[in-house]
Amino acid sequence: MFSWLIPDIPELFLTISVWFRLQGWEDNTKLGFIIGNTLTTIFYILRLAQDTLLAGVSRKLIRDYELFDLSKSETLLSDPAFSSYHDVLFNKHHSTANASSYNKRVRKVTSTVYWSTYFLLLLSCYTCYRLFNTYKVYRIYYLKDLNLDKHPSLKKIEPDYEVDEKLLKTSLKSKLLSRFIRLLQLQDEVETELPKVTEHYTLNKWDPSKLIISLSTSFSPTIIICLMYTNVTFLTVIPIIIHQGIFYFMIWNRYEERFKDDALLMRENYLQYDTKYVKPLKQIMYQDVMTDTATISDGGFTKFFPVSKSTLFKHHEMSGDVIIERYNKKSREFENVTDIIKPHHHINNTVKILPPTIRKDHKTNRYDHRQQSILKDRKFNIDSNEPQIINALTTAIPSRSFFNNNPSGSNDDNCSGIKVRSSPTRETFFPATPLRKK
């Protein structure tokens, strides 16, 4: 039977350790408040027992009552004059023996309470130490500023990256021998992945867990030290409750909610930046149509609305690298996008635009600006003798099929033209004119 249980013992310990890791104790704030308030209550009860119950008894135990006892002398007991007092001395001896056993019990209880209070005091100081000594180390490579040396959390290190020796020593001491090979592999990977820069900094960010914060605020060393070196009575519970309430209100209802609000605002700013700047660079605007053929007898229902579709495709190689590609309609192949900041839907064509030809209409007394151009091979070709040439990265898109939504539904040719999209947020409209013959 025991031979069956022995192979299952490592699996049992592994299951228990995995279960403890999956519980998420670091983020359990409710558990920290329960444990901290319970320990504070226990410390208050121990100090109250010391000052009210054990203080008077401990004063009596300071003197030693084990003096020389004449009733134990055999010479005096053989004397007939002393025998009359023998019974009285015998009863007194039994009473002192009972008192001594009672005193021993009181001393044990007093010492237990005394060491328990000091243990709770050290435990509170340890939680406070864990609160203020929990950091995450980050390496700053690309931030260049003249005031970085004055930052209290930044530390300048050597240009060449070296693995921390303390981390290696602790890893080698705590891990098994089989982890040594994996540690060397990770060291090689980190050295190859890190960029080669001239100098960099290390940032020690204070990052305690929520469990430690809740435990330290509910079992703080301030209230423990005050209870340790003051006279505790029944009315002392009132300032304890006020202290716990102020700490809870200040740390969680205000300070912790501020971090949540900052994270929410940061997310809102990120989404706003992504909507206004990133998506217009990565996506193309199309015009979709939605029709309802069920009511075709009544004229039907047609609705045009703009949509954005991305032409970037992301996939992973076998090595784990992320590759971003786009489809080239000319070559009918996928191309790697090396610079995604560049608008992928803009074509690097040279657009040559003539200055407008001004013609005065005598009937309306207005000037008609017309642009004479020839659209050929997605370029505007003009005479080379014209003085003004504007070079832009644009795409000529028919305005009616993509951007011009005529709500009246008319097919008037006067509304036709070409929209030149020079940026994701700016569009220029040039009226279409008859092509000029060469």
Curated annotation (Swiss-Prot):
GO BP annotations, alphabetical order: maintenance of rDNA; regulation of exit from mitosis
GO cellular component terms given for this protein: nuclear membrane
Lipid bilayer topology: Multi-pass membrane protein
One Pfam short name: DUF2418
Chief localization: nucleus
Keywords: Membrane, Nucleus, Transmembrane, Transmembrane helix
Positions of transmembrane segments: 109-129, 219-241
Spans annotated as Disordered: 405-438
Organism domain of life: Eukaryota
Function: Member of a perinuclear network that controls recombination at multiple loci to maintain genome stability. Required for rDNA repeat stability.
Assigned protein family: Belongs to the NUR1 family.
The name this protein goes by in its record: Nuclear rim protein 1
Provenance organism: Candida glabrata (strain ATCC 2001 / BCRC 20586 / JCM 3761 / NBRC 0622 / NRRL Y-65 / CBS 138) (Yeast)
